[in-house]
Amino acid sequence: MTYPLRGGVALPRVGLGVFRTPRGQTTRGIVKTALDLGYRHIDTARIYGNERDVADGLRDSGLPRSEVFVTTKLWNDDQGYDAALRAFDASLEHMGLEQIDLFLLHWPVPGKRLASWRALERLRAEGRVRAIGVSNFMEHHLEELLSHANEPPSVNQIEVSPFLQQRGVRALCERYGIAVEAYSPLTKGARLAHPEVVRVAAAAGRTPAQVLLRWGLQHGLIVLPKSSAPARLAENLAARDFELSPEAMAALDALEEGLVTGWDPRRAP
């Protein structure tokens, strides 16, 4: 199950997020376990401090590099044209890789995001990264970027769940062919026990987590759940293997409440 990005890049639609996964052997082991279970998409970032561990887990798996999609991100302190290029070099060195599959601007930093984007365009043109995108960009950020960019982002990674559906941003992304990745698709656990989620899950013979992930997949999203438990990793990946009924989707669609569980980029200028 992949999403076709520009340039023939295939993005696996269920990925493993490693935000706040402890550095060192913990992340390394989780990544290897996930890859052994069938994950082929790992999402890290410079600010997470575990880029090297992700790459080590990939190597431990024995899988060919070409079979695993690796995303990392440019942190705020490294934005700006020259700084972004240096930070990318550092990420590549930390990971010991020759190429990154997807490189994202982590946040729409005022006064620097356009110059940072030009750096990402250069990296993609040079073949050092296969696809480029953004994270936490709302409609006004995207409209500004699209009016200045030589090429639009391939991806926008934002928080999305049935409780925070981001319909306006998603519609804009669809208009410009920008894939939407959903981080915190499980609401950091805050709504797994919601009565309607539990009801839909029971009717489908699935878990609440699988139902939330499947909702995202059926809306065309790439979902990035995180877990350190092998059983949960397998459970999340199995969201690919069933389909929710139109009635179940409508019930989940009705749960919008503007729930933000992390950063809120809607307030970013």
Report residues per predicted region:
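Acidic-and-aromatic substrate-binding clefts and catalytic sites of carbohydrate-active enzymes
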Residues: 21-25, 43-53, 77-82, 108-112, ...
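N-terminal binding-site loop/beta-alpha segment at the start of enzyme catalytic domains
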Residues: 1-68, 187, 261, 266-269
